[in-house]
Amino acid sequence: LNRRLSEISNDIQVSFEFFPPNTPEMETTLWNSIERLAPLKPSFVSVTYGAGSGTRDRTHDIIKRIQKDTALLAAPHLTCIDAGREELIQIAKDYWASGVRHIVALRGDLPNSDEKPSMYASDLVELLRSVADFDISVAAYPEGHPEAPNPQFDLLNLKRKIDAGANRAISQFFFDIESYLRFRDRCVTVGIDVEIIPGILPVTNY
């Protein structure tokens, strides 16, 4: 991994994604991983975010420690599927007040119901833009979103997020570099001219 990243570092920027730890052992693994990956100089690192205040608080705590103890740029994930508009506005204000300037804006996983979501990622981007001048990343899917009926639908959905004010897109994980490069070219054809950063999920145990 180190060798491959060094080979492409001049052409393609990468980001790393981490999960908030649930146990002391997982927390030790997390910080060991961050220490080992920091010399690779990713564009930024992101920390996932789940439903419930406990996970959200852990995400915020990890972000604050990364900001304090490392030179890495850190970005929390924020999802809109399980929170109302006023709650999201308050979360965004709290992040801004604590010095967080970069947020990864996501819809989030749908619950097990037929009810359509009241907000999508593009709506969340607009909401964040209304709160403060955040640096906003959104998700991209080089191999296609599982809910998209076709690749063009998926691509136009990404364009809506960019048009709403996102600064860049982070790809979901992929196993074929050619699929990423083709996707990046297709983005240009529909007028998406922001960075499409390959996301990397570090394997911390196996």
Task: Please identify what each model-predicted range represents.
Residues 5-9, 34-41, 60-71, 92-100, ...:
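Acidic (Asp/Glu)-rich catalytic clusters
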Residues 12-20, 43-47, 74-78, 103-105, ...:
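Hydrophobic faces of well-ordered beta-strands that scaffold small-molecule active sites
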Residues 13-31, 74-86, 137-153:
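Active-site mouth loops of central-metabolism enzymes
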Residues 21, 42-61, 108-117, 167-186:
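Glycine-rich, proline-tolerant flexible connector loops at the mouths of alpha/beta enzymes
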Residues 53-77, 118-139, 181-200:
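Alpha-helix-loop-beta-strand connector modules within alpha/beta enzyme cores
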